[in-house]
Amino acid sequence: MNKSFIIVFVGIFGFGFSQIPTGYYDGTTGLSGYSLKTKLAQIITNGAKDMGYGSGTGGLWLGYKTTDIDKYYENDGTIIDMYSENPAANTPGVSNDPYEFKWGQASAGGNQCGSYSGEGSCYNREHSIPKTYFGGINAVPMSHDIHFVVPTDGYTNSKRGDYPYGEVSTATWTSKNGTKVGPSKVPGYSGSVFEPINEFKGDFARMALYFVTRYEDNLTSFSQYQTASSPLDGSKNRGLQLWYLNLMLKWSEQDPVSQKEIDRNNASYTFQGNRNPFIDHPEWVEMIWGKSPLAVDDASFSKNLTIAPNPVKGNIINITGDQDLKQFKKVFIYNTVGQNVQTIENPFQNGNTITLKNLPKGVYILKTGELNTKFIVD
């Protein structure tokens, strides 16, 4: 991933430049697990306003003018659409995006939907948790909640339908920025899924965790709308089926909070009066749900990533690949039961040699970005 604007976590005080109101999270100290989740649900429900779905340029349409403007990639003031943004376009004012949208209605020169016949026609309102999972457009305030309803290309949104997010084995459709539709390769679910690009997987994961926290008192009632594609599990506590929870935890870990998310969280708070706590305090994800597991069967090992020596006899290994490894900000090492046993920050800043901590003899998976490989400690 290429989030050059990732902000380094600075402990319990949250992220640099995050504007968390003083006292907003009072009462959370010492809590963990579902007790913490319930306390957060109370906090982010108090003060939350229903700003409406919107007609004309009102409701969510109005919110997007402050929550989803590009100040990070091209920095050109267009709408950030996570289904079309090309993060390789890193020169301010220069776009490699397949298409771009201006905020506002067509009558005022904007690209708000409207009808569409293909990619790039217009942007609409995408429920990252599909509204069919919780009762449709008339289920309020959730269908109007800007924290998980985002502007995206209308056509790509329609290609998603109500598929859950996931990781695709073989794409049956691919958008112009690499977003995919296809059968799931995630253990526990074999249906069709919609896979966003790596740059935004953590964003969507934290939206899902926000949803099952903000609306935890409604989750059992959402069971009446359960479909084969819905990853909600009908429980107030965990909120998500295990396969989906594990995926969201993995994405949240692999794609850390960015300045874009921090700014969006602040703007959403100004707009509707509540915050996404997992952007302000990403450590709460693990404190509530635990660590992300990675089953060995989930790893299709990359031929273009190698470790030497292998088997490993000391604690120094050299990693080579056919990509520039400096683009990867973390290396994760898992054991064969899927536990994360070591995380290495900025591993390739000074070369391709990394130091393992004292790992017991056995088989391990090393993962960086979308690349992974198996190695043995002897």
What are these regions (language model features)?
Residues C113-R125, K131-P293:
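Domain-level detector of nuclease and nuclease-like folds
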Residues F17-A48:
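Boundary/junction segments of secreted and surface-exposed precursor proteins
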Residues I7, A299-D378:
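C-terminal outer-membrane/trafficking sorting elements
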Residues G16-I20, W289-S302:
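Low-complexity, Pro/Thr/Ser/Gly/Ala-rich linker/spacer regions in secreted
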Residues Y83-N90, V212-D217, T368-G369:
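Short, flexible beta-strand-to-coil junctions
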Residues M1-P21:
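Bacterial Sec-dependent N-terminal signal peptides
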Residues G47-S175:
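Betabetaalpha-Me/HNH-type nuclease active-site subdomain
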